[in-house]
Structure formats: structure tokens, C-alpha cells
């Protein structure tokens, strides 16, 4: 079926170029970060864990690059890696919350980081609608194939049975793609917002670094936020390279296994390997140097699964067309559809699990963020916080799984206490 929509879909991470161009000189961060690691044991521990986890994800992605594709197992490894890193950032920020509150600039940095999660709510709602449409298409196919397989011969002649089955298969084909304009518009919006936020993070980090070089908490929090973001985009770039440029992904995987010191030096080494492999494709290198928030990886992994699902839907539609040509070809065509339906069902389920992980991550972070912002504002309810709470409630209210989850109950409790505090 292909892309029948007018919206251009994101295919790679080169959209980060504009943000990268705003900050041309990125050489200061690794050295500054290494000095902070030497002075702060906790940051050094984080550095070691980050490198180990990111290296494992890069190796998993690069293991299948010869076929220019990603296994679901490697996607799970990458997503798990980036979710773990993001949760560690949340922990460090909350541990240092009082010091963060005392520094307005540092507080703004952390606030920008957390508010980036809010932009994904509309996208997740659009994804949920698309998954429901995909499951409806799956049900149409399943019923058509079941009737053909189980209906007694006496109930209808073979030709009538085939005609009935083909009618239902045409119904599936007429339904079109489950991923509509709304879905791709939401994807593009969130992707652009995340990349814009990355530029703000980097500019603010540099400004504050000049003013607060001697402040230990700032160096710890800003270093962890930046390096986590940096590692996230590095892994994202390997995911993109696994499909578009397998030799690049292989070179990165080889470089990831080299013992070169701290994560700062390790990532710098990977960047050099990447630059050599691309033979001067500075656009991609610049995009990698920007660093990014975890949501970009969430979106990129979902995009890969969506595109994979669209290929399967298109393939099944081709099987339907083949079955329409000749009644004798119907049986073979239906057998082909059965095989593809199994892959289709698995892809829908995997995509649903990916979306659930995103939702649960947000359910876990937002209650903590509510208290963090509320306390920092002296128990005052800001307009953005109020909008965030309403948006979150709208999402949760539509999904029975959220209503019964401890994440949702925690958020309800958090919201109630916030309302009481500002009443």
C-alpha cells in the first residue's frame, strides 16, 4: 500500500542538523566531563554503567546489519538501554533536588528535560488509535481465513465459499493503512520538538558551565543529563545505520568494544570511527554530536516497527490481488495470507508493547515531576503544570489498563495532593 498520505515520514536522524549548526564547536564537552568524573565518584560510577549498557545495545543492533534490518530482540535491547539511562537521570535529579532548586538556571535545565516527555502524549494517543485500526484489520483477516478453513462443505459450494472469503479479504484491503495523517503529523511534531529541546539543553549547559564550573552538583547533574542524551543519540544513529549503511554500524560496534577510558573518550572515539566510515558525511556526525532526549529513541524504534508493519500489510494486499485473479489460485493465495497474517499479528503486538512501555515510563516520571515542580514553585500551580496534569488524565482515562495500574493511581494521588497544596 505504501505511503498514501501527504506527510513526509522521518527516515533518519539527520533532522538534527539545524540544532547542530547552532552549536558548531562541540569539543569542550568530553574533556570537561572527564574532569568531572575524576572529581566525583558517583559520576564516575554512572559513567562506567552508561558505557557498558550503551556498548551492549550498539553491539546488539550491529549484529544483523548485513541484511539492513533490525531484529525485535535488538530493538528491545536498545529501548531497555535508553529507558534505564533515563530512569537514572530521574534518580540523580531527585537526589540533588534541593541543590537544583537553589539554582534557577539549573532548575530550568532540568525542567526542560522533564517537559520534553509531555510532548509525546498526543503522539501516543494517535499511536493508540492506529493500533486499534490495525487490530481491526487483523480481525477481518482472521475471520475470513477461519471461515474458509472451518465452514462445512455442505453449507456452500466451493466457489461460493471462495467468493465469500475474497469479499472479506477485499474489505481488509479497502480499509487501507491503519497509520493515518494524524499519526504521522503527531510523529513529525514530537520529533521536531525533541530536537529543538536538545539544542536548548546544549546551549544552556554551555552557558551554565562557564558560570558554575566549581559547583559539584551542577557538574554531576549537567554531565549526566548531557552524556545520557549523547549516548541516546549515538545508539539511535547505530539503529539508523543498521538499515541505511551497514558498514558504519559494524565500524561503530567494533569501536564500542575498545577500552579507551571514560565514556567521554569512548564516545569521542566512536565519533571518529563513524566519521571515517562515512567518508566525510559531516551532516550525520553533527547530528550525533548534538545529543538527544530518550523520547527520540522511543520514536525511532516505533517508526521502525510501523514501517515493518506497513510492508507486511502491503504484502498481504498483494496476496489478496493474486487470489482474485483465478479461483484455482485462491487456495494458494489464502495460504500465503495465513502465513503473512502471523507476522502481521506479531508486529501489531510488538508495536503495542513498545507503546505500553512508553506510556508506563511517562506514568512513572510524571508524578515525581509534579511534586518536583510544585515544591520548587513554593506549592504554586503553574499553568504548564496544570495543562500537563489535564493532558495526562485525558490519556489515562481512555485506557482501562491505565485506570487499574499503580502508576495511574500514584499520579491521581500526586495530583490530589498538589490541588490540596494550592487550594
Curated annotation (Swiss-Prot):
Stretches for region Disordered: 1-37
Bias-annotated ranges (Basic residues): 1-14
Localization terms from the record: Membrane
Keywords: Membrane, Transmembrane, Transmembrane helix
Disulphide bond pairs: none
Transmembrane segments: 224-244, 247-267
GO cellular component terms given for this protein: membrane
Protein name stated in the entry: Putative UPF0496 protein 5
InterPro entries linked to this entry: DUF677
Predominant location category: membrane
Its membrane topology: Multi-pass membrane protein
Lineage summary: Eukaryota, Viridiplantae, Streptophyta, Embryophyta, Tracheophyta
Species this chain originates from: Oryza sativa subsp. japonica (Rice)
Membership in a protein family: Belongs to the UPF0496 family.
